[in-house]
Swiss-Prot record:
This is Phosphonates import ATP-binding protein PhnC 2. The gene is phnC2. Its EC number is 7.3.2.2. It is a peripheral membrane protein. Keywords: ATP-binding, Cell membrane, Membrane, Nucleotide-binding, Phosphonate transport, Translocase, Transport. It comes from Halalkalibacterium halodurans (strain ATCC BAA-125 / DSM 18197 / FERM 7344 / JCM 9153 / C-125).
Length: 244
């Protein structure tokens, strides 16, 4: 198992319960879609995995190591292997597409070299290769804010791939996109992650897209897992119960 979550709980300082208790395991190479209503705890769960949200209790084992116990250098090392794709892209808009993808390599560089943008030639070649795979090679030198929303999200995927991660977390990556752009983004994400053997966990509101692209689906409601199975096993009744 590349990821194992045991007794994960999150209570915010104001008393809001983000996660009641989650236990699950994820195999290497799987594409998992996490579905559920707004406020169910999907984003809290996803962001707990790389400690963007600090769990209240529980354990999260990434490739056998508990990231909840990691501090300082060890935490940075573990985060290098966990790529993140954000709902609102999180790109540096005034920088080029290529520079944004190269930022996926910053975790492997010294602070000085990273700050000066002194990337190794092999990093640049790798970034251009990834851009080609997401259909954006010809946009490499454009500013990120000159691209459409769907294209910007593909840059976000390319940046995550450039980290050479073993795990990618994608938090509502198509929430702001039209259906065609959404399908393109999920297609590129699934294809490249399959080719590279990267495990992917994606939060989605759109159940039909989740069923089309996921190997396995996890339904979260009120901070707990209420469904865990294949897309074929997810019935209309289960969806209705999940979103009631």
């Amino acid at each position: 198992m590349i990821l194992r979550v045991e007794g994960l709980k999150k209570v915010y300082p104001d008393g809001t319960v983000g996660i009641k208790e989650i236990n699950t395991s994820i195999r290497r190479g799987e594409l998992i879609s996490v579905i559920g209503p707004s406020g169910a705890g999907k984003s809290t769960f996803l962001r707990s995995i790389n400690r963007l949200v600090e769990p209240t209790s529980g354990a999260i084992f990434v490739e056998g190591e508990n990231i909840c116990n990691a501090r300082g250098k060890k935490l940075r090392q573990m985060r290098r292997k966990i790529g993140m794709v954000f709902q609102h892209y999180n790109l540096i808009k005034r920088s080029s597409v290529l520079q944004n993808v190269l930022h996926g390599r910053l975790g492997y560089m010294s602070t000085i070299k990273g700050g000066l943008g002194r990337f190794h030639e092999s990093d640049t070649k790798r970034a251009l290769s990834i851009l080609k795979r997401v259909g954006l090679e010809e946009q490499a030198l454009k500013r990120a804010d000159e691209l459409s929303g769907g294209q910007q999200q593909r840059v976000g995927i390319a940046r995550a791939i450039a980290q050479n991660p073993t795990l990618i977390l994608a938090d509502e990556p198509i929430a702001s996109l039209d259906p065609t752009a959404s399908e393109n983004v999920l297609h590129y994400m699934k294809t490249i992650c399959q080719e590279e053997g990267i495990t992917t966990v994606v939060n989605l509101h759109q159940v039909e897209f989740a069923k089309k692209f996921a190997d396995r689906m996890i339904g979260i409601k009120a901070g707990k897992i209420v469904f865990d199975g294949t897309p074929r096993e997810l019935t209309d009744y289960t969806v209705d119960q999940l979103y009631q």
